[in-house]
């Protein structure tokens, strides 16, 4: 729109902002992260400065805890976690050597998530913090998942319990939905809500940027890609329920993956009552909103067929987590979108082919 194009944004839901939608809970007055916690973090200054235009951002450090059979510990695994878990008082070098001795010595190149974990941290820490959580989150054995999933959870040999190491970490003071509404507040932008995408709509536009699931866009004609979906069990409590925003639950004795207390995601606000949601993961079925692309071997083979379908046309670009079938954080999606807008406008001005994806899906 800022480049002079009339833009029509269509969303199948009755609100903008997608999975990062936030809304004020009527019963408690707490700002709710409706589709689970979203903490913005980035070291990309261009992304950070772009977002400053559309809302007030409050500094926020995400300090996640894990409830295990041995007690509650900090994540990511850090020096405090290690000393507390093993009942030791090691320094950084001692702990590094200790974990190295725990690590599996017979795994050279990890073939899956379990082998990656065993190679990095050994069986005790893996069993306590990752195995059960992975089974519940992904609905399959960790040996069926690629090794690179575990790279999102580093081990630190200091007392830093900040979940992220990004330079900018914050939450929007008035919620993500307000930020997105401000982005869309432009005379060349028209928004239509509660309208599912239909292939016939494509004829109405010179170009379509599709952020929905790539397989759904083609009517699942090549088959369904694997996704995980989420659902939540809500409860309201007086006062402070758990003392922190997020507690992961990696044990298999409870079916939920984590517990979120929304008031702690707005620490600048004051509320007497507290909204708590227990989060559950499930396989995506017809009618479910997809959240996490699984990207198993069979999915990648199927994805290649959908990519070929995309490459056979020229007036549709697939964007975001679902459009590229990749696990992406918010800051990555925004960076990709800014880069894509620049590249698309440049290609349009030259009369050259437009980009087909905001990020290569394969």
Report residues per predicted region.
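Glycine-rich FAD pyrophosphate-binding loop
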Residues: 1-26
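Conserved beta-strand segments of alpha/beta enzyme cores
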Residues: 6, 31, 56, 188-192, ...
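Short hydrophobic core segments
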Residues: 10, 204-215
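A conserved beta-strand/loop capping segment in the N-terminal third of enzymes
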Residues: 21-33, 40-94, 153-158
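Structural/interface elements that position substrates and couple domains in central-metabolism enzymes
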Residues: 49-50, 125, 242, 254
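Conserved beta-strand termini and adjacent loop/short-helix elements that scaffold enzyme active sites
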Residues: 60-62, 192-196, 262, 319
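Active-site/ligand-binding neighborhood in enzyme catalytic cores
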Residues: 66-73, 79-207, 218
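C-terminal segments that line or cap access tunnels to active or ligand-binding sites in enzymes
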Residues: 205, 215-355
């Amino acid at each position: 729109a800022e480049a002079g194009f009339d833009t029509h944004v269509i969303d199948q839901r009755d609100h903008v902002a997608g999975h990062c939608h936030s809304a004020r809970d009527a019963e408690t007055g707490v700002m709710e992260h409706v589709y689970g916690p979203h903490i913005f973090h980035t070291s990309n200054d261009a992304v950070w400065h772009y977002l400053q235009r559309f809302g007030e951002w409050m500094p926020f450090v995400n300090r996640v805890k894990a409830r295990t059979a041995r007690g509650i510990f900090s994540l990511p695994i850090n020096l405090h976690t290690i000393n507390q878990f093993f009942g030791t008082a090691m320094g950084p070098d001692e702990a590094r050597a200790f974990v190295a001795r725990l690590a599996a010595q017979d795994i050279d190149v990890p073939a899956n998530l379990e082998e990656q974990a065993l190679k990095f941290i050994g069986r005790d820490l893996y069993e306590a913090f990752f195995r059960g959580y992975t089974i519940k989150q992904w609905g399959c054995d960790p040996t069926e998942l690629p090794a690179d999933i575990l790279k999102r959870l580093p081990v630190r040999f200091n007392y830093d319990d900040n979940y992220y190491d990004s330079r900018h970490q914050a939450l929007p003071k008035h919620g993500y939905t307000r930020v997105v509404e401000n982005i869309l507040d432009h005379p060349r932008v028209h928004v239509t809500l509660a309208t599912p995408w239909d292939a016939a709509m494509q004829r109405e536009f010179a170009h379509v940027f599709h952020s929905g699931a790539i397989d759904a866009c083609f009517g699942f004609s090549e088959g369904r890609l694997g996704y995980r979906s989420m659902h939540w069990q809500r409860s309201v409590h007086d006062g402070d329920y758990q003392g922190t925003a997020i507690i992961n639950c990696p044990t298999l004795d409870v079916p939920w993956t984590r517990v979120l207390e929304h008031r702690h995601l707005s620490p600048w606000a004051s509320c007497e009552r507290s909204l708590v949601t227990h989060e559950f993961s499930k396989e995506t079925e017809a009618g479910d909103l997809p959240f996490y692309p699984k990207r198993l071997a069979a999915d990648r083979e199927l994805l290649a067929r959908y990519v070929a379908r995309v490459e056979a046309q020229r007036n549709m670009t697939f964007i975001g987590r679902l459009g590229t079938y990749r696990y992406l954080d918010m800051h990555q999606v925004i960076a990709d979108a800014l880069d894509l807008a620049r590249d698309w406008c440049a290609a349009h001005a030259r009369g050259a082919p437009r980009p087909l994806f905001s990020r290569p899906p394969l």
